[in-house]
Amino acid sequence: MTTTTMAGTPVAPAAAKPWYKVLYVQVLIAIVLGAIVGWLWPTVATNDWIKALGDGFIKLIKMVIAPIIFCTVVSGIAHIQDAKKVGRIGVKALVYFEVVSTFALVIGLIIGNLVRPGAGFGNAAANEAAVATYAKQAAGQKSVDFVLHIIPDTVVGAFAQGEILQVLLFSVLFGFAIMSLGERGHTIRSFIDDAAHAVFGVISIVMRAAPIGAFGAMAYTIGKFGTGAILNLIGLIATFYVTAALFVFVVLGIIARLAGFSIFKFLAYIKDELLIVLGTSSSESALPSLMEKLERLGCSKSVVGLVVPTGYSFNLDGTNIYMTLATLFIAQALGFDLSFGQQLTILVVAMLTSKGASGITGAGFITLAATLAVVDPRLVPGMAIVLGIDKFMSECRALTNLCGNGVACVIVAWWEGELDRDKLNAGLSRQIDPTDMETAITTD
């Protein structure tokens, strides 16, 4: 196996870029500057144009998510000659998702019971109108509605509205259809492969705006909510961040070690995506570039195309930790002593409601409303307690979700025997520049 660029030339070790041209450095500086502007000049930071910088960047990313998923999934399936292989990858991915998601939920419950961050909490000023908005959205969420929602009314509508699961369903069916064509499908397979490279080219252009988007999003957040907004609830925030770190470095670290790679080197490899997510609070904003990097890291196109998009709805580890911790915190703050049976109910309910939480900012808060309503409707008003700091917790949710899905893809590829060890080692040892958008492909 040799590693080449799209032009067919060997990939040399990446030359070091000047520090100020490195994307993650630019994003990190932008986040710090945004926080300073939001703190010192909140009136300026909450201007609609500042907010538009962050919102605009997220919209640019979301603009290409549907075509990226379509091209990668269709291409991955269409190039597989064995239909059973697709099903095998899907089953392995779902098994992994459920096992690891359960670990995330259990860790959240254990830490919440040990630390009890909501114990002795004073009465919070309820923002009933804002809570009612989330509760109303959650009220209509039923399992049957979630299943039916996966099926689009029209294919065009699925793409136009950016519904990931709907696009994924159509892409899988379309990929199988091309597979069944055999040699007759060669032309359309080649066209979709070329289209995928073109869309990734769009991503490389859009990513240049990441520092601007991160600056706007962070400035607006600090300017609107202020540093004082988190002081009363710093215990919950700290508990959540520590729990998420424990999950990433211990649970995912052990899983990564079993597969033969270091979680620390992997996180260093995806540092650009982590910082983009930190600035935008949306794990979805890093989906296209994450898929590109995982292919360069040695995961096969078929595994990346199936596992990553599916994981954004079925493998939200950060959201799982958040829901168990936040539910316990609200119950403790309101003086409810949840029984062991009720806490088991949290596990079961959260396992279901989290499946509808996409990588969009704020989706975790809506699923929290759904979980509280099922566990005990009296807990729903307590959402007002965490409403003010949800924005500060959403960064950690999104970061953990991103880490979980990245590791999941590598693990499933390793489990399926579709992981190129040479490319994995080269990528994690930085012999291949992960920021180079000239896609490294594997040739026999």
From Swiss-Prot:
Keywords, comma-separated and alphabetical: Cell inner membrane, Cell membrane, Membrane, Symport, Transmembrane, Transmembrane helix, Transport
GO BP of this protein: L-aspartate transmembrane transport
Record's subcellular location: Cell inner membrane
Family annotation (Pfam families): SDF
Topology in the lipid bilayer: Multi-pass membrane protein
Domain of life of the organism encoding this protein: Bacteria
Main location, first listed in the record: membrane
Manganese as UniProt keyword: no
GO CC term, one of those recorded: plasma membrane
The keyword Metal-binding appears for this protein: no
GO MF annotation, one: succinate transmembrane transporter activity
Disulphide-bonded residues: none
Transmembrane segment boundaries: 22-42, 60-80, 95-115, 162-182, 198-218, 236-256, 321-341, 346-366, 399-419
HAMAP family: C4_dicarb_transport (MF_01300)
Entry's family note: Belongs to the dicarboxylate/amino acid:cation symporter (DAACS) (TC 2.A.23) family.
NCBIfam families associated with the record: PRK01663.1
Function: Responsible for the transport of dicarboxylates such as succinate, fumarate, and malate from the periplasm across the membrane.
Protein name per UniProt: C4-dicarboxylate transport protein 3
